[in-house]
A protein has these predicted regions:
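Metal-coordinating catalytic core of metallo-dependent amide/deamination hydrolases
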Residues: 1-92, 100, 129-136, 141, ...
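Short, isolated positions in well-ordered beta-strands
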Residues: 12, 275-276
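His/Asp/Glu-enriched, well-ordered alpha-helical/loop segment
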Residues: 75-86, 93-114, 118-119, 124-128, ...
Length: 279
């Protein structure tokens, strides 16, 4: 089975910032707090919390549970119980703590299957470390549509990037997509469209250079997702694999990205047996 561990909170994610980054956040937060959407901006600020300077000289926000020094022990227990581990880590501080926990036990990365859930605000250095450790990242492109407008009111300070899917994929990270329902819409076609278009709910672009192709987004939902879950006989249609498939009313590769969420499933097949039919 798979155990879930939270390295940070959801709304109170663990960001680790320099003094310069904190000043940038304060400026954008103040500006947004007096702007036309000040109510939303102030609510976001309350949920993010106030950064605290810690002995490492960096400023940290968010909830960390368990304490970072407990993570290596938790990972070791998972390895000894033959469990995989899904670590909830939204902010760069949380992702870095997962990498440090793996580094603290030299053989741990080979003994336990670990995947990072979310990794929403990270920089190029962390992306390189995730890739070097071949750590899968399970991301939620639907968050771009559901929460992108709110998050861009007070954007993460550079060099942090918001859901940098293109950079992750190009670096060699096994990138898997999920919905995180009910936090975002369950429909995977909404997620595919979000990964390809990177538009928020108001139609504004969010770092469009981080967009994926439709084919890449579909792979993240299928083949890479199966690999991340350790399923050797799923995720692709080929001899020897399970005949798990859906029949849809449109070809996603020939459908406009904006129309992808409207694709309808006509029938579902599991192990070669039809288990659902709308026709």
């Amino acid at each position: 089975g798979t155990a879930k561990v939270l390295a940070d909170g959801g709304e109170y994610c663990h960001l680790c910032m320099t003094s310069k980054q904190v000043r940038t956040v304060m400026k954008t937060s103040t500006r947004a707090g007096f702007g036309p959407e000040r109510g939303l901006a102030r609510a976001m600020g309350r949920r993010a919390g106030f950064p605290r300077r810690e002995p490492d000289g960096m400023w940290h926000t968010g909830i960390r549970f368990p304490e970072e020094n407990a993570l290596p022990q938790i990972l070791r227990i998972a390895a000894e119980s033959d469990s995989a581990l899904a670590v909830h880590a939204i902010g760069n501080g949380a992702v870095a703590s997962v990498l440090r926990a793996l580094a603290a036990d030299s053989g741990l990365a080979e003994d336990v299957s670990v995947r990072v859930e979310h990794a929403m605000a990270i920089d190029i250095a962390l992306i390189g470390s995730l890739a070097a450790n071949r750590l899968p990242v399970v991301a939620q492109p639907g968050f771009l549509t559901a929460f992108g407008h709110e998050l861009n009111l007070t954007p993460v300070p550079k060099p942090l990037q918001l859901m940098p899917f293109r950079t992750m994929l190009d670096a060699g990270i096994p990138l898997t997509f999920s919905s995180d329902f009910p936090a975002a819409e369950l429909n995977p076609w909404t997620g595919v469209a979000a990964a390809a278009a990177r538009l928020d709910s108001h139609g504004s672009a969010i770092d469009p250079e981080q967009a994926l192709t439709v084919a890449e987004a579909l792979t993240a939902y299928t083949a890479t997702a199966a690999d991340t879950l350790g399923l050797d006989d799923a995720g692709t249609l080929e001899p020897g694999n399970r005949a798990d498939l859906i029949w849809c009313d449109a070809d996603p590769h020939a459908t406009a990205v904006a129309d992808l969420p409207g694709i309808t499933v006509l029938s579902t097949w599991i192990d070669g047996r039809r288990v659902f039919s709308a026709v």
